[in-house]
Swiss-Prot record:
SUPFAM superfamilies in alphabetical order: ACT-like, Ribbon-helix-helix
Full protein name: Putative nickel-responsive regulator
Keywords, comma-separated and alphabetical: DNA-binding, Metal-binding, Nickel, Transcription, Transcription regulation
Listed cofactors: Ni(2+)
Coiled coil: none
Purpose of the protein: Transcriptional regulator.
Superkingdom of this protein's organism: Archaea
Cofactor note: Binds 1 nickel ion per subunit.
């Protein structure tokens, strides 16, 4: 098995150690391997291919980190074909939340979410995806 070195904030490293201890993992590597498998599995879910989807993406970042807000603006414009709606809100005294409603194919939504997740200085990125063809408005 190969060895991979990664950088992360001390706080995240401590959280991984605590998580490993509390959940019976043998160490950080096992936690990171499982997290990577799960993340990759999210983007490789074949059940959602070739279907019309809607997604909600929520991004949390520090108010002082203007580069994140600027990056979100560029992503919104670069992906305007799938961004149905976008909402910006202040959370508490220090944070901003950016919410995107997307409509499109899995490949396009995955590309958007990947770019959001890759944005430096985001504190949290969450999303959910729902096939539009599963929605029965008359039930």
């Amino acid at each position: 098995m190969g060895v991979v070195s990664i950088s992360m904030p001390d706080e995240l490293e401590e959280r991984i150690d605590t998580f490993a201890d509390e959940h019976g993992y043998t160490g950080r590597s096992e936690v990171v391997r499982e997290a990577v498998r799960n993340l990759m599995g999210e983007f490789e879910d074949k059940r959602l291919e070739d279907r019309e989807l809607m997604a909600v993406v929520t991004v949390l970042f520090d108010y002082e980190t203007t580069t994140v807000e600027e990056k979100m603006m560029h992503l919104r414009h670069d992906h305007e074909s799938i961004v149905a709606s976008n909402f910006h809100s202040h959370v508490g005294d220090r944070y901003c939340m950016e919410l995107f409603v997307l409509e499109g194919q899995l490949e396009d939504i995955s590309a958007f979410v990947g770019k959001v997740r890759a944005t430096k200085d985001t504190l949290s990125v969450d999303y959910s995806v729902l096939p539009v063809d599963d929605i029965n408005m008359f039930t």
